[in-house]
Amino acid sequence: MRLSNNDDYFQIGVAAEGATTISTVDADTAVGHLTLAPDGDLVLAPASKKTIINSFDRLYFDGGSDTYIHEVSDDKIQFIVGDDGDIMLQLEEKGADGNEISFGSSCVGFTQLEPAYDAANTVVDFRHSNKQNLTFGAGSITHLSLYFPLVSGNFQLLIKQDGTGSRTIAGLYKVFEFDETAADGVATVVWAGGSNPTLTTDANHVDILSFYWDADNEIAYGVATLDFQF
């Protein structure tokens, strides 16, 4: 299909076994863009289950300006965001040398959740965030139930005394795996030193409990950093 200028055109080429190429030709420059604008969804349904972008091409998300994903070299992908060309994320497969995720000059954070106080059994669900902030309610807590995800990781719980203070966790620090069943390895936290920490009881003071969750063996290792004062 050609316009009045015969040097600018659109063509469909069909090769062996029906392999088809759609192309445009701009004789003067390189702005023979191809726009697909359906009045509905654009559906890609290849029988091979593959949608292929050539090596080192860029997939843009802001109209072709400065936010894109691209393959830098074999087995290395970068996410570039913003007009400064910042590398927000880089993924690299290094064979026998392992795999690497680099955040470059980016910081990484979590939404801090606030578990609901329950005097009998307060639930802290690390499946939804690695960082949790719990304030005692009108009394102490008997048991603390910790839910961990399917993967291993580091998790932190900040525990704050209320304005009255003298609140304690007297019972068990129970450990549950991702499916909400008791951890098969050890069903309670394994604390440094062998016993539950003695929490600070002064009003408004803070303790931070840090856990390493070994998802393979289903064991939560805990250490307490005590008595942040205000």
Locations of the language-model features?
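Acidic, glycine/polar-enriched metal-coordinating patches/loops
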Residues: 76, 135-230
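Low-complexity, glycine/proline/serine-rich flexible segments
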Residues: 126-130, 134-138
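Intrinsic low-complexity, repeat-rich intrinsically disordered segments enriched
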Residues: 1-129
